[in-house]
């Protein structure tokens, strides 16, 4: 590694960590309706939205009403996006006259963007019109992270409130999350990207004559605005087929730094938002320490692995510094690994290098980041509510070990809460192991694998892990655009999204109804290094150990067989 690599890593952590406490407090004030510096500008817009939609902003909902509103909103969003993708050939803003997507691909794409996964079994510039990109995909890029943020806020209220029957208003939370939480930051990032050369235009694709005399089509479009929310909303779906490896999505080292840092900017800030809800920022610091520890362990492993020379070239005269297959030379190995680890630690899924070309252990780190439930920062809202589930599980295990009724911040965890926690633990195994095993055992679906042996199995394992974790990245050699995989990965995405959201909303309702006992000397502290260590071990054992046999058949076997 060179001095530039260390400067990149330092700048990344400074951009992410320095504004996090301030931004976390801002999100708390926004979601609770307190006045902020944006209120004079956006307050009238917010109130106008409520009047237009007929929403009574002062009327809160119980968890069942909140759940029904959330499901109805997401269902309507899915149907609208599905229709736009099917009918885009008949709709305006389609200068390339692209036809509508095939029905199973349209289903997969609509589910993907509604669930904040952004799995793409298509190439954007070749199959999606400008209107579909803006009216369909970009809209969901805003409302899907806003949904995750709303669910997180409900869980925070459930932990913080006492003897309460209501948890907020879904329509109010969605409006505030979108208007205050996402739009201003996206506007700023979009302007920075345009400054760096990312296109933002409605012009037709350009045509150029190459030096060889051939005609080349150069895709354009309103890219900067979608890329901004793609990164900040932990969406990840690229405007172009190769995502942020494309020079129009990510042209410079500066744009690369802005984009990779923006992936976890909001998820890190929301850790501090939780601390403001429970009036104890020590809880935030303990959770953030665990997240950073897991991130640094995975990142260090991936950097070491990816800087190893390829054993297959040792007998040749080729001088190896680091493997650059599948990477952009303008980003280098460290910039590519940093992105790969960050995008899988969050439920983002965007890429600036091809994950299918990563060394086996680097690919395994990416998979493990997803397999533990996307709790290492995770998606907007989704990452922290997933981490809080592990916090409650760790508290439950600690209670079993010391023979006391487990409680978290004065709220006792009883049978109903534990049952809901266990239900969430089944989400990833069902999506990855059950659906993945079925796909691997059927000759038709297994034919999507384009490599033999362990790496081929890793391709399939990565696909179903990515779908279940709502990540969206892929080993791109996997032939995902078949009716079977479009439907089954779509099912995995739905399980991975709503298999968490529904139990969490029920859990929030149950916790909110409880009284809060004052913390005493015998209470198990959840803000110190001991609990941080317990939480880390819980995540690795409960969340990760389940998948060790499949990892042994995939990336571990490949690593050993290649002689690294």
Swiss-Prot record:
GO molecular function, one term: P-type potassium transmembrane transporter activity
Subunit and partners: The system is composed of three essential subunits: KdpA, KdpB and KdpC.
Gene source species: Pseudomonas putida (strain ATCC 47054 / DSM 6125 / CFBP 8728 / NCIMB 11950 / KT2440)
Pfam family, one: KdpA
InterPro entries hit by this protein: KdpA (IPR004623)
Keywords: Cell inner membrane, Cell membrane, Ion transport, Membrane, Potassium, Potassium transport, Transmembrane, Transmembrane helix, Transport
Protein name: Potassium-transporting ATPase potassium-binding subunit
GO cellular component, one term: plasma membrane
Major location (coarse): membrane
Protein family membership: Belongs to the KdpA family.
Subcellular location: Cell inner membrane
């Amino acid at each position: 590694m060179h001095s530039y690599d260390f400067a990149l890593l330092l700048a990344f952590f400074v951009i992410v960590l320095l504004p996090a406490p301030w931004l976390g407090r801002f999100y708390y004030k926004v979601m609770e309706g307190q006045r902020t510096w944006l209120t004079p500008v956006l307050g009238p817009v917010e109130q106008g939205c409520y009047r237009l939609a007929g929403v009574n902003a002062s009327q809160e909902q119980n968890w069942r009403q909140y759940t029904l509103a959330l499901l109805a909103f997401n269902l309507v969003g899915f149907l609208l996006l599905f229709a736009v993708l099917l009918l885009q050939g008949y709709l305006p803003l389609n200068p390339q006259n692209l036809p509508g997507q095939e029905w199973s691909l349209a289903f997969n794409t609509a589910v993907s963007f509604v669930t904040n996964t952004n799995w793409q079994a298509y190439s954007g510039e070749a199959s999606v019109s400008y209107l579909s990109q803006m009216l369909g995909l970009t809209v969901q890029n805003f409302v899907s992270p806003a949904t995750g943020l709303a669910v997180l806020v409900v869980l925070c209220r459930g932990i913080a409130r006492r003897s309460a029957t209501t948890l907020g208003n879904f329509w109010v939370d969605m409006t505030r999350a979108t208007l205050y939480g996402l739009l201003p930051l996206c506007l700023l990032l979009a302007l920075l990207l345009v400054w760096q050369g990312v296109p933002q235009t409605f012009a037709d694709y350009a045509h150029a004559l190459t030096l060889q005399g051939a005609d080349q089509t150069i895709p354009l479009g309103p890219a900067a605005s979608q890329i901004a929310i793609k990164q900040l909303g932990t969406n990840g779906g690229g405007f172009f087929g190769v995502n942020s490896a494309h020079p129009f999505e990510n042209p410079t080292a500066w744009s690369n730094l802005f984009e990779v840092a923006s992936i976890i900017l909001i998820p890190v800030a929301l850790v501090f938002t939780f601390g403001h809800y429970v009036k104890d920022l020590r809880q935030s610091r303990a959770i953030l320490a665990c997240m950073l520890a897991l991130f640094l362990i995975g990142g260090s492993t991936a950097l070491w692995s990816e800087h190893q020379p390829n054993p297959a070239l040792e007998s040749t005269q080729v001088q190896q510094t680091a493997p650059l297959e599948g990477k952009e030379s303008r980003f280098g190995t460290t910039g590519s690994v940093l992105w790969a680890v960050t995008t899988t630690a969050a439920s983002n899924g965007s890429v600036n290098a091809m994950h299918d070309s990563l060394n086996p252990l680097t690919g395994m780190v990416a998979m493990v980041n997803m397999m533990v439930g996307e709790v290492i920062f995770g998606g907007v809202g989704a990452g922290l509510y997933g981490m809080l589930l592990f916090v409650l599980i760790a508290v439950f295990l600690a209670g079993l070990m010391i023979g006391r009724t487990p409680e978290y911040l004065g709220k006792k965890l009883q049978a109903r809460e534990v049952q809901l926690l266990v239900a969430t633990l089944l989400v990833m195994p069902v999506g990855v192991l059950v659906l993945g095993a079925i796909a691997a055992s059927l000759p038709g679906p297994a034919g999507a694998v384009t490599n033999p042996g362990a790496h081929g199995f890793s391709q399939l394992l990565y696909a179903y892990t990515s779908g279940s974790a709502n990540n969206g990245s892929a080993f791109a050699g996997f032939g995902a655009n078949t009716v079977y995989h479009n439907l089954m990965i779509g099912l995995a995405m739905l399980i991975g999204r709503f298999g968490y959201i529904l139990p969490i909303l029920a859990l929030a309702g149950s916790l909110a109804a409880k009284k809060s006992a004052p913390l005493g000397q015998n209470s198990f502290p959840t803000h110190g290094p001991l609990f941080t260590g317990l939480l880390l071990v819980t995540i690795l054992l409960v969340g990760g150990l389940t998948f060790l046999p499949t990892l042994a058949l995939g990336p571990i076997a490949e690593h050993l067989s290649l002689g690294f």
